[in-house]
């Protein structure tokens, strides 16, 4: 079968690989759609970050080259021995976290903080940029009736956003800022609306993405290339209760902090390619808080329920659909060159 595999920086190859077979406790899926994620783009431009290269990942037991793709959905085609609660033909979304189940974080149920954290399609395993995938049954979530396959491919990134907002201290009626209106930033805007934020101020240089943010319910969308974003946010709010950093751009982190009020909170959502710095006194003198957030835990059912209510709409977020053979040029390179894109979905080969 065809699969898109990471061999190195700017080296994604579509090649033939063996079709996977499910072992006991595993599920085989005919992939439908897979989204290209910001994390995939980081691996393409500056990897390896999550991709194991020197030695096999302790849970996937794989190393590069690996089949990419972790934002995916499809249809169950085969069940390994012992799998219950699923049936052939079920439409499913995949929660792609590798977790050991034995470290202190896993014992607390915080499997996204596992000492050996990994992701199908980043750390090995049968990623979604392929015709078929095989994953452990615990990663498989049956989709509600009426949810489209394109919508299913957005469950994973929407889970990132919803987890970040849940982890924050935002309360109904509070104010928020979102720095960066890529796919995750826009999904954070939607999650903030669900949480009852009274004002949501988005900072984003792309005009198309700013308009998307407004369409999704942002109060304002600020162009940082022509406006002092921090000053504008502080003028409107006196400082927001919570700011979300969703750019991975070093100079933006201190802006997020300075956009918050006293005792404000900054959530760092991005995966970073380089170091960032800030003046600690900006945190100390206002008793502000910094909070990291990674992936999600126990939120897939909530995300899919919200989708049935019209939230996290694929129609509003997907800007391009491509074939797997075009993944490098029309997918990764397009995301680098054209900041008007939000979410690009890759259709699985037959």
Regions found by a protein language model. Give the residues of each.
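Adenosine-nucleotide cofactor-binding segment
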Residues: 175-181, 193-255
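Rossmann-fold NAD(P)-binding glycine/threonine-rich loop
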Residues: 270-286
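C-terminal hydrophobic helical "lid"/dimerization subdomain
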Residues: 250, 254-258, 297-350
């Amino acid at each position: 079968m065809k699969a898109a595999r990471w061999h190195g920086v700017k080296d994604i190859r579509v090649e033939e690989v063996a079709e996977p077979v499910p072992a006991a406790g595993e599920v085989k899926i005919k992939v439908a759609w897979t989204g290209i994620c910001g994390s995939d783009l980081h691996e393409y431009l500056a990897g390896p970050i999550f991709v194991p290269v020197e030695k096999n990942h302790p849970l996937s037991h794989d190393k590069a080259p690996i089949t990419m793709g972790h934002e995916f959905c499809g249809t169950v085609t085969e069940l390994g021995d012992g799998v219950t609660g699923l049936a052939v033909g079920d439409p499913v979304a995949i929660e792609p976290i590798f977790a050991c189940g034995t470290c202190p974080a896993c014992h607390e149920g915080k499997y996204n903080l596992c000492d050996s954290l990994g992701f199908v399609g980043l750390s090995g395993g049968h990623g979604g940029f392929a015709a078929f995938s095989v994953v452990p049954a615990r990663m498989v979530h049956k989709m509600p009736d009426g949810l489209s396959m394109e919508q299913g491919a957005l469950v994973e990134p929407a889970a990132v956003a919803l987890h970040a907002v849940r982890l924050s201290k935002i309360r109904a009626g509070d104010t928020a800022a979102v720095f960066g209106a890529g796919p995750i930033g826009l999904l954070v805007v939607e999650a903030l609306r669900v949480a009852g934020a009274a004002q949501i101020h988005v900072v984003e240089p792309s005009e198309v993405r700013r308009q998307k943010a407004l369409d999704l319910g942002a109060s304002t969308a600020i162009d940082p290339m022509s406006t002092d974003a921090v000053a504008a946010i502080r003028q409107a709010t006196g400082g927001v209760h919570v700011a979300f950093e969703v750019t991975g751009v070093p100079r933006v982190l201190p802006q997020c902090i300075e956009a918050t009020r006293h005792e404000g909170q900054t959530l760092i959502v991005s995966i970073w390619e380089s170091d960032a710095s800030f003046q600690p006194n900006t945190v100390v003198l206002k008793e502000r808080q910094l909070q990291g957030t990674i992936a999600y835990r126990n939120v897939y059912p909530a995300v899919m329920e919200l989708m049935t209510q019209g939230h996290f709409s694929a129609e509003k977020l997907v800007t391009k659909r491509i074939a797997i053979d075009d993944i490098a040029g029309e997918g990764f390179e397009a995301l680098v060159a054209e900041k008007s894109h939000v979410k690009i979905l890759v259709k699985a080969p037959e």
